[in-house]
């Protein structure tokens, strides 16, 4: 079967010019021109796809077949080219008849040429009629082939235009939320290839609007994103600078039972002491021991971490830009993180995705409760994954240790060796195993990994939060929310 590309080659038709003409006409479409004027960043991202479009169209032409009628006509034309003048004139009536049988557009013109020449009365004296006939026939074949090209390219144009309009609508809606520079616009354009309709990404728009109403959350994400932007280089002249360390002090914070002692703490009485209140003979003895602080009670003990400022020698020569690694974001989905906390946590992840797109970084989300759920928001299908993430509800338990263990395993992967871990939680959880804390310290010291805590509550346990390099506080209590609103 004759292919369209072969016919182009034999008739010396330039398919590249036809494709170029189609692409130029497509980009000049009024609906696209208006959109490009409104979103120039997305236009620049789209222009990078044009070479790929042309290659796909060329491949489509190579795979297309010529209709049987045109293929038979072209075969007849090739046979006629090989004949000398006597043979050609002898077969000319048969050629005209075959053209009529094939319903060729050239059939009428061929019949007219033969009738005008009147070969029966005026035998040809040269090859002028043969040359004219073959030239007109070739022109007709070229026109038929170009018509097939136009039909094929028009189908591709309609499909491509519909796809572009869908992707442009998606990118245009998300552009104010997720893009801050050309790099982010390009990555957003690449991520818009999924089969998403307008109703699918409405949730993204809702959280984008919520994020705009929380400017403090945006600033917090930007500060976290820039926190690894520079590193200090030593210089010969040393000087001192203050720095803050966390000092551990034993305290009676209710973290764990460490024994029994004598006190007057009614809330932590042993059951045997309460028995005395039920016996009239021992009731006065109970009150006497209460006044003397000699009642047997549970001893609850934990760690109280306080900030202490010290001096250390430091020398700085310059700040050299560091490559910014990907984000591994762990989100607490326990019941205490529901409601406004859930909205803030999801919006903060959206803000981190915006930074990741702008800085060409990756953004990996892990939800920790009774099981670990993974999403990579910066992947090619990142928009679909972001929508699935935003549809999650925070109603589980808290398993911070399992999440941190998964984060450490992820950091062992070569693709994530320079990642920053971001933990979003209220940090009202059980104490971390000492072995896990030790592994985290190794990652921090040996591999320069940074662990960030985004605390959504003022009541997080100090014993948990001491492992983090940075603690970013965003108190979601009603009082703090009212204060932030009043300051705007």
Curated annotation (Swiss-Prot):
Pfam families: VWA_CoxE (PF05762). Keywords: Chaperone, Cytoplasm. Homodimer. Interacts with RavA. SUPFAM superfamilies: vWA-like (SSF53300). It is found in: Cytoplasm. InterPro entries: Uncharacterised_CoxE, Uncharacterised_ViaA, VWF_A, vWFA_dom_sf. This is Regulatory protein ViaA. Component of the RavA-ViaA chaperone complex, which may act on the membrane to optimize the function of some of the respiratory chains. ViaA stimulates the ATPase activity of RavA. Belongs to the ViaA family. The keyword Cytoplasm applies. Coiled coil: none annotated. One of its GO terms (cellular component) is cytosol. PANTHER family: PROTEIN VIAA. The keyword Nucleus does not apply.
């Amino acid at each position: 079967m004759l292919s369209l590309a072969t016919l182009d080659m034999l008739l010396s038709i330039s398919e590249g010019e036809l494709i170029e003409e189609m692409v130029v006409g497509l980009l000049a479409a009024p609906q696209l021109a208006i959109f490009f004027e409104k979103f120039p960043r997305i236009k620049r991202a789209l222009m990078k796809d044009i070479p790929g479009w042309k290659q796909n169209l060329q491949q489509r032409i190579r795979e297309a077949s010529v209709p049987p009628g045109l293929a038979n006509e072209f075969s007849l034309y090739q046979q006629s080219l090989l004949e000398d003048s006597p043979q050609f004139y002898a077969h000319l009536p048969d050629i005209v008849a075959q053209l009529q049988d094939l319903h060729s557009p050239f059939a009428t013109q061929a019949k007219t040429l033969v009738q005008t020449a009147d070969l029966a009365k005026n035998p040809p004296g040269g090859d002028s009629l043969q040359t004219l006939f073959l030239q007109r026939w070739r022109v007709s074949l070229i026109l038929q082939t170009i018509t097939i090209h136009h039909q094929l390219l028009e189908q591709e144009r309609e499909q491509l235009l519909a796809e572009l309009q869908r992707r442009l609508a998606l990118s245009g809606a998300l552009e104010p939320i997720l893009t801050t520079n050309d790099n982010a616009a390009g990555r957003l354009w690449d991520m818009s290839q999924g089969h998403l309709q307008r109703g699918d990404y409405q949730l993204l728009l809702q959280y984008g609007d919520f994020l705009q109403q929380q400017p403090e959350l945006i600033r917090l994400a930007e500060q976290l994103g820039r926190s690894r932007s520079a590193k200090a280089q030593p210089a010969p002249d040393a000087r001192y600078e203050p720095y803050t360390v966390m000092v551990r002090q034993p305290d009676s914070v209710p973290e764990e039972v460490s024994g029994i002692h004598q006190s007057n703490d009614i809330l932590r009485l042993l059951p045997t002491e309460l028995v005395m209140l039920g016996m009239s003979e021992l009731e006065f003895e109970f009150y006497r021991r209460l006044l003397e602080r000699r009642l047997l009670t549970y001893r609850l003990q934990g760690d109280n971490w306080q900030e202490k400022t010290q001096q250390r020698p430091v020398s700085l020569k310059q700040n050299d830009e560091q490559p910014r690694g990907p984000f591994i974001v762990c989100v607490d989905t326990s019941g205490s993180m529901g409601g406004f906390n859930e909205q803030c946590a999801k919006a903060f992840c959206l803000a981190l995705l915006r930074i990741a797109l702008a800085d060409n970084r990756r953004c990996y989300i892990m939800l920790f409760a009774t099981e670990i759920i993974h999403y990579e928001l910066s992947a090619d299908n990142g928009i679909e994954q972001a929508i699935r993430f935003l549809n999650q509800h925070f109603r589980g338990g808290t398993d911070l240790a399992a999440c941190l263990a998964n984060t450490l395993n992820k950091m062992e992967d070569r693709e994530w060796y320079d990642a920053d871990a971001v933990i979003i939680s209220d940090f009202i959880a059980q104490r971390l195993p000492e072995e896990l804390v030790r592994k985290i310290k190794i990652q921090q010291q040996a591999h320069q990994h940074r662990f960030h805590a985004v605390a959504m509550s003022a009541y997080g346990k100090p014993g948990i939060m001491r492992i983090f390099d940075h603690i970013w506080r965003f108190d979601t209590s009603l009082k703090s929310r009212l204060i932030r609103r009043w300051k705007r």
